[in-house]
Amino acid sequence: VVRAFADTLGGAGVDYEIIIVDDGSSDETPRVLERLRSEVPALRVVAHPSNEGYGKSLRDAFAAAAKDYVFYTDADGQFDLAEMLAFLPLLDGGNAVVGYRVGRAEGALRRFVSRGYNLLVRVLFGLKVRDVDCSFKFLPRRELQALGLHSDKFFIDTELMVKLKRAGVPVLERGVRHLPREHGRSTVSPTHIFTTLREIGGLLAERRKKETGPEPGPRTSEEVD
């Protein structure tokens, strides 16, 4: 994946950096990344001593980013990274361009759950994107780093898109081919459903708090009738 990024972006003449988050891996990943750093000078590694979650990994990568735009994707080979190049002309310096999966290489149940979840966030948050969890997104770095993201889990994609909407960041969508998984396996489990429901409640409460404003403080003696 690192070499594919470097070949794709370097060949296009793009000023880039590559940030890999090693989320507490217990295999040969740290040594592989160390070797790659000598081959790819643009590579930076953020290492977690233990597994801290998908959302925390993304938040740490976002915080470490230094270029004008942040692109993120997973390392499981389900996207052709060359499709990034078709997104570049759509960037205008302050907008986000997010992918939606075309020809999803997943089972019927997974597709059904995804459609239901996208409908849910559309109803609850007015979020009019086709595929909120598609991990193929270009985001303006300054606006991204100012969002105040909190999720450590898979809800990070939804929180990100909801807060981009609240911040008034324009969002464009573009289809991206979805390929069978090449590496690893999905770590989503039934417990993530309950975590997501709890985080949805928290984000709704945050919205209500912003809409109603802060609780009024105690009045001074001059304000008392």
Annotate each predicted stretch with a short phrase.
Residues 3, 198-225:
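Terminal low-complexity segments of carbohydrate-biosynthetic enzymes
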Residues 128, 149-152, 161-179:
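Catalytic donor-sugar/metal-binding loop of nucleotide-sugar-dependent glycosyltransferases
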Residues 16-19, 30-64:
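Conserved donor nucleotide-binding strand/loop of the catalytic core
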Residues 1-9:
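Short, well-formed alpha-helical segments that are part of the catalytic scaffolds
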Residues 48-64, 69-72, 78-154, 181-203:
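Acceptor/aglycone-binding surface of glycosyltransferases and processive sugar-polymer synthases
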Residues 79, 156-163:
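Short active-site alpha-helical segment characteristic of glycosyltransferases
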Residues 22-31, 77:
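A conserved acidic beta->alpha catalytic loop
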Residues 20-22, 47-49, 100, 175-177:
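Residue-level recognition of beta-strand->loop/alpha-helix junctions
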